[in-house]
Regions:
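Asp-based, Mg2+/Mn2+-dependent phosphohydrolase catalytic module
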Residues: 2-37, 42-46, 59-78, 85-269
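Conserved phosphate/oxyanion-binding catalytic-loop motifs
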Residues: 56
Length: 269
C-alpha cells in the first residue's frame, strides 16, 4: 500500500537516480529482504542509476561489496557509498593529501590514495575505535590539532551505542571534547548530514530533483534527505516503527511496505 506524506509531491518522471539504504531496505542482518533481488533487477532494467548507502564506519567498501555479491546482486564497488568514501571525495575536492586516521585499521583500505602523516597531517579522520579510543589517543589527537592547522573530519557524531549488551559512549562525545579543547568545529560526514547527500548526488552527476531516497530510518534516511530537499520514501521494514506514521515533525513523501513495491511505483509514473 502506498501512503503519501505531507511535505512534497514527488515528480517521478524527473527521477533518474535512486539512493537505496542497505541495512533495513535491501537486507536485514545476513538476510535479503524478501523480493529485494528481483526488485533491484527491475529497477536496473528501467535504467535507474543506483547508489547503495550505509552509515557504517567500521567496514571498508570492499567487504560490503563481498556481502552484497553473496546475495547475487548486480553491483560493482563504486555503487556503494559510505562515510569513509564521502570523506575521501571531500579530501580530494579540497586538495588534502596528508591525513591521520583515527579509525580501525580495516578502514585504511578506503584511504589508500592518501599519505598517512602522524606528525603534521592536514586532516584527522575520526571513526569508530571502540575500546581503543582512550585518554592517550584523545590527547595525541588533541596535540596534533592544537599544534597544526588541522581539520577534524568526523564520520558520524552518534552520542552512544550498544555493544556486548551494554550501553556506552560512541564517537560523538570524543568529537565534542576535541571541538571544545581546540576551539575548532569538526566537519561532519555521514547520514543525515548535508555533506553526505551532496557528495553522493554529485558523484552520480545528478541534481537533487533527479534522485529519490529510499530508507527505513525516519531520522538518518528520511530526515537527512528531506532537510536537503531530496524526495524520500520510507519502507515498512528494518528500523521502521508504527509511531513513525504519526511523527508530527518529520514525514516522508510516501511510504511503501518494502522495496518490492518500488519498481511498480516508478514504472507507472
Amino acid at each position: 500500500m502506498l501512503k503519501r506524506g505531507k511535505i512534497l509531491k514527488i515528480n517521478f518522471n524527473n527521477i533518474k537516480g535512486l539512493l537505496l539504504d542497505l541495512e533495513g531496505v535491501v537486507y536485514e542482518g545476513d538476510k535479503l529482504v524478501d523480493g529485494a533481488q528481483d526488485a533491484i533487477n527491475k529497477l536496473l532494467s528501467y535504467n535507474f542509476k543506483i547508489k547503495y548507502l550505509t552509515n557504517t564506519t567500521v567496514t571498508p567498501r570492499k567487504q560490503i561489496l563481498k556481502k552484497l555479491l553473496k546475495f547475487k546482486l548486480s553491483i560493482v564497488e563504486t555503487d556503494i557509498f559510505t562515510p569513509p568514501i564521502a570523506a575521501s571525495i571531500f579530501l580530494k575536492k579540497n586538495k588534502i593529501s596528508k591525513i591521520f586516521l583515527l579509525t580501525n585499521k580495516l578502514l585504511q583500505e578506503d584511504f589508500k590514495e592518501f599519505i598517512i602523516d602522524e606528525v603534521k597531517p592536514e586532516a584527522i579522520i575520526m571513526g569508530d575505535l571502540y575500546k581503543a579510543f582512550n585518554w592517550e589517543r584523545l590527547n595525541e589527537v588533541f596535540r596534533l590539532i592544537h599544534n597544526n592547522d588541522t581539520l577534524i573530519i568526523a564520520l558520524h557524531k552518534n552520542k552512544y551505542c550498544k555493544r556486548e549488551n551494554k550501553i556506552g559512549l560512541d564517537l560523538g562525545p570524543f568529537d565534542a571534547a576535541l571541538e571544545y579543547a581546540t576551539s575548532k568545529k569538526s566537519i561532519l560526514i555521514g547520514k543525515p548530514e548535508k555533506n553526505f547527500f551532496n557528495l553522493v548526488i554529485e558523484d552520480m552527476g545528478l541534481g537533487k530533483e533527479e534522485v529519490l531516497m529510499i530508507g527505513d530510518d525516519i531520522f538518518a534516511d528520511i530526515g537527512g534527505a528531506k532537510h536537503n530537499s531530496i524526495p524520500a520514501i520510507q519502507v515498512r521494514t528494518g528500523k521502521f516503527q508504527k509511531k513513525d506514521e504519526t511523527n508530527s515533525h518529520l514525514q516522508p513523501d510516501y511510504r511503501i511496505n518494502s522495496i518490492v513495491d518500488l519498481p511498480n511505483i516508478l514504472k507507472s509514473a
